[in-house]
Structure formats: structure tokens, C-alpha cells
Amino acid sequence: WGAGWCWDDDDNPLLLPLKYDNKDTFADVFISRLRQRGIYVSGSQGTKALPSGAKEVSSVSRPLRSVMRPMLKNSNNHCAESVFYAMVHHAYGNGATARQGQTMVRKLMTKAGVSNAASYDIVDGSGLSLYDYVSPHAEVMMLRHAWQNKDVYDFFRHLLPVAGSDGTLRRRMRGTRAAGNVHAKTGTVTGVRSLCGYLTASNGHHIAFSIINQGVNGDDGTAAQARNMQDRICELLASNPQ
């Protein structure tokens, strides 16, 4: 995957969102689609710099919403990495690196009011890296910042999974005041389960929340306990805002 994946401590500058075991997934999929249409490609594929006289034949770009929807609703990590590098490319142009992305995220954290943003470790776009370190406080400050910017909030909130309805929360909090109310992103890595997002309390107050449970796993039931605790907290917040 690139930076932050433990085996890349040699500061490898090649960072692509769809890179597995030195195999370019995009090129493989593209060649496969060409073959389906009777077009066969010989030789090897890889990444190279374009010659100065190269002409663009075609450009395909998906709307941001169509990428962020599966990224947030279904926790699609491919999309998350792609958005991370697309953000850097938009700001810096070709040759985007993870380090540039890390700098951009920390600047946004500072703008959102996160104190000492440099102390947090942001190394990738998906959050799957074992080197990522954030806190519930930092996440709530980012959620608050989005809420304070109406266009961002309206766009972002409607793409989050909805409790008891869709995405990674479709089977959770059903039959409670949190169902259809909680809009939140789940997070799952080894030993960690998290949930952060928004809900509306019974008094009409809008609440941003972040819950991170560490030291849990699926083998001893602690992961399920963590999810149940998260759901219960959301139910209590939705029913009893005091």
C-alpha cells in the first residue's frame, strides 16, 4: 500500500493507493477490461514518466460523491487512499506523496482547533496503518469543524452510515432512538473498534461524538462487547442528553 505499512521503513518514495505486493492493480484491471473488449496488450506494465511530446487520449474522473459514498458507507479503504492522494495531487500536482498528505491533514487539524496537531501520527488515508495515532478529542474537533461549515457538513453527514439503515451500521441500534438518527463512521483494525459521527438528542441538540475501544478482539468476545457499548452510549445520548 505504501507509507505506513510497517515493511516500508526504508522511506520508499513510491506511494500509490492501489499498489499490492509490487503489483499495479489499476493496470491489471485496465488490461483485463481491454481484453473483455477484444483488445490485447503485450509486454509488461508499470509506471514511467511521460515523454515531453505525449498527448492525452482520454481522461476519466468520477465525482467526489461517488467515491466518498462507498468510502464512508461501506468503509472502502481503496477509496479512502485514493481520496487522500487525489487531495494531495489537487494541491501539489503530479508526484503526490504521503508526507504531503500528512502535512495537509495536520494543517486542517490545527485549523479545526486541535491543539498540538503535530503530536498526532497521520500516515495514510485509510487509517489502517499501525502507525496512525489519533484521539477521540481530535476526531470530535474535526467533526465540529465540519459542522461549522454548512456546505461541508451537509455533504459529509449524508454520506455517513446511518444506524439501523445502511452501510456498516445497517444492523446496529435497530429499534432504538439511535436508529435513523446516528450518522457515524465505524473503524476496525486489529485490537481496536471505533465509532465517530453525529446524532441529534431528544432536546434537539446536535452532538458530535467519538468512541475508541482498544485491546479488543473477536476471539474472546471483547470486540462485540465494544460495539454493544458504543451502541448503548449512542442510545443514551439520543434519549437522555443531560
Regions found by a protein language model. Name each.
Residues W1-F155:
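A small/polar active-site loop signature that marks catalytic segments
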Residues F84-Q242:
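Small-residue-rich helix-loop
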